[in-house]
């Protein structure tokens, strides 16, 4: 599970669409067939869909995409992409151009049962370097309307970045005692980051 279910809560409260066309912020893209299908997924991800056919000889698709201002990272490979630039790259069938901006905090569930909408006990937190950020993780049972009665969880995650030093603070889970997991395991993954000389937890 990616963070789509968790992101939806934030956008329901604010009224801002979870998926926004890229041309909302870059109007010139609307008239450019190469980039007009790009869109933002939540506040942290940019998706650049591949719509062209794959070259059957190379087993690759040549794809052109535009990265907006700032520093962005390929969500799959972690490769760094400076912004405000046009790019051309080959993609394999299993690849997909999704980019996370610097400072993104992406929560993922490690469970293999994708049909299970319950609150996970194991979470992987992927962090992309470069900018300090704060993310609030929202969770409910994913099935009932009990969240209206306050049966949901919130976890604040703070990422403080200062050159080669960075700190991550995962604050205590807020929520009614009946749904707070007895134990939660976090796996921290720092993308495009050199191996740390020292780690303190």
Roles of regions detected by a PLM:
Residues 4-197:
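Catalytic core of carbohydrate-active enzymes
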């Amino acid at each position: 599970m990616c963070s789509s279910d968790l992101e939806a809560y934030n956008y329901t409260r604010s009224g801002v669409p979870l998926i926004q066309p890229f041309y909302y912020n870059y109007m010139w893209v609307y008239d450019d067939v190469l980039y007009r299908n790009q869109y933002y997924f939540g506040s942290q991800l940019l998706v650049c869909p591949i719509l062209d056919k794959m070259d059957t000889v190379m087993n690759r698709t040549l794809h052109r995409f535009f990265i907006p201002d700032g520093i962005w990272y390929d969500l799959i490979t972690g490769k760094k992409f400076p912004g405000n630039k046009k790019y051309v790259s080959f993609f394999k069938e299993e690849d997909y151009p999704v980019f996370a901006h610097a400072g993104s905090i992406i929560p993922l569930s490690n469970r293999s049962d994708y049909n299970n909408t319950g609150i996970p006990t194991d979470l992987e937190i992927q962090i992309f370097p470069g900018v300090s950020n704060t993310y609030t993780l929202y969770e409910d049972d994913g099935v009932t309307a009990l969240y209206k009665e306050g049966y949901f969880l919130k976890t604040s995650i703070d990422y403080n970045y200062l050159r080669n030093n960075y700190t991550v603070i995962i604050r205590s889970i807020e929520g009614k005692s009946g749904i707070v997991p007895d134990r939660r395991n976090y796996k921290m993954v720092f993308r495009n980051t050199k191996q740390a000389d020292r780690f303190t937890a």
